[in-house]
């Protein structure tokens, strides 16, 4: 069974899962939020590096279907441009995460910061992997609400 079409979804959903974990797992222990977020960014960078070995992937599911009048798929596209931008976004994102662990070390709202940072990474990766303008617009607007 070929699972290459699931790989872009893993890259996209990785920071979202990290943000949810930070939301629920760090109510008592705020120090673990940085670890979860940095590990998520590291796995995203490692996955972006591994994506170069994959062929071009296009995977989508129908999101909105109003017959022939309007059909909006929800999908990801992993081509050479997306692979390049994945390296840029995950590489810079990982460095930001590393810097933030030291910068936010004594801050009381560290868990909230790393949760928002993971959501921001999710939005940026969504823009990179979007296969249509509707999906790109959704992730662009989500990015502005996180910041």
Model-predicted regions and their roles:
Residues 1-9, 20-115:
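Transmembrane helix-loop-helix hairpins at membrane boundaries of multipass inner-membrane proteins
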Residues 146-147:
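Conserved small/polar residues in nucleotide/adenosyl-binding loops
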Residues 135-136:
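Short hydrophobic/alpha-helical segments at membrane-entry points of transmembrane helices
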Residues 13, 39-42, 91, 119, ...:
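Hydrophobic residues within alpha-helical transmembrane segments
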Residues 17-19, 119-124:
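Hydrophobic, membrane-inserted alpha-helices
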Residues 130-131:
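Helix-breaking motifs and short loop linkers at transmembrane-helix boundaries and internal kinks
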């Amino acid at each position: 069974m070929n699972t290459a079409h699931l790989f872009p979804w893993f890259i996209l959903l990785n920071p979202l899962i990290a943000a949810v974990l930070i939301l629920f797992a760090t109510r008592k222990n705020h120090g673990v939020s940085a670890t979860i977020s940095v590990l998520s960014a590291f796995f995203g960078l490692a996955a972006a590096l591994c994506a170069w070995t994959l062929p071009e992937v296009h995977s989508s599911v129908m999101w909105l279907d109003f017959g022939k009048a309007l059909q909006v798929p929800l999908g990801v596209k992993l081509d050479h441009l997306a692979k390049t931008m994945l390296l840029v976004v995950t590489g810079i994102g990982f460095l930001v995460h590393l810097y933030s662990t030291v910068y936010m070390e004594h801050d009381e709202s560290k868990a909230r910061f790393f949760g928002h940072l993971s959501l921001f990474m999710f939005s940026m990766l969504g823009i990179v992997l979007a296969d249509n303008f509707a999906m790109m617009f959704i992730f662009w607007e989500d990015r502005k609400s996180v910041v």
